[in-house]
UniProtKB/Swiss-Prot annotation:
Residues 110-141 are annotated as: Disordered. It comes from Campylobacter jejuni (strain RM1221). InterPro entries: Ribosomal_uL22, Ribosomal_uL22_bac/chlpt-type, Ribosomal_uL22_bac/org-type, Ribosomal_uL22_CS, Ribosomal_uL22_sf. Belongs to the universal ribosomal protein uL22 family. Residues 117-134 have a biased composition (Low complexity). This protein binds specifically to 23S rRNA; its binding is stimulated by other ribosomal proteins, e.g. L4, L17, and L20. It is important during the early stages of 50S assembly. It makes multiple contacts with different domains of the 23S rRNA in the assembled 50S subunit and ribosome. NCBIfam families: rplV_bact. GO terms for cellular component: cytosolic large ribosomal subunit. Keywords: Ribonucleoprotein, Ribosomal protein, RNA-binding, rRNA-binding. This is Large ribosomal subunit protein uL22. GO terms for molecular function: rRNA binding; structural constituent of ribosome. GO terms for biological process: translation.
């Protein structure tokens, strides 16, 4: 298992988490190919982190899977924008840390599962119940 950490990316963590969720558990080569065609800014950074994690472990991209892809909030840059009547409003420029872990893909042999037959019993049809109340007749006057 190998890791790669990219710090202080000028990107909102919530936007980057949407992309990280897509590649989690995928083959690294397939993940980088799909990130290449995503229009989002964070896709480029996450693809860079995946390729860096693969290189850190000395693996080939087709033999590892993305075990975890985590995006954490980093420091927020705060700026001010002048507004009307001498006031100012705050502009938040969020940054994020991207951590990617890749691990060798485990080859699992398929196990045959024996499925037990379900025994079904036939139920007797439900009986109609009659009410014991007498019908009340309205008298017309």
């Amino acid at each position: 298992m190998s890791k790669a950490l990219i710090k202080f990316i000028r990107l909102s963590p919530t936007k980057a988490r949407l992309i990280a969720r897509e590649v989690r558990g995928m083959n690294a080569e397939l993940a980088m190919a799909s990130l290449k065609f995503m229009p989002n800014k964070g896709a480029k950074y996450i693809a860079n982190a995946i390729s860096s994690a693969v290189a850190n472990g000395g693996f080939e991209a087709n033999e590892v899977i993305v075990k975890s892809c985590r995006v954490d909030a980093a420091a927020v840059l705060k700026r001010f924008r002048p507004r009307a009547r001498g006031s100012a409003s705050r502009i938040r420029k969020p940054t994020s840390h991207i951590l990617v872990e890749v691990a060798k893909a485990e080859v699992k042999a398929e196990e045959k599962k024996t499925v037990a037959k379900k025994t079904t019993t036939t139920k007797a049809p439900a009986k109609k119940t009659t009410s014991t109340k007498k019908a009340t007749v309205k008298k017309e006057s």
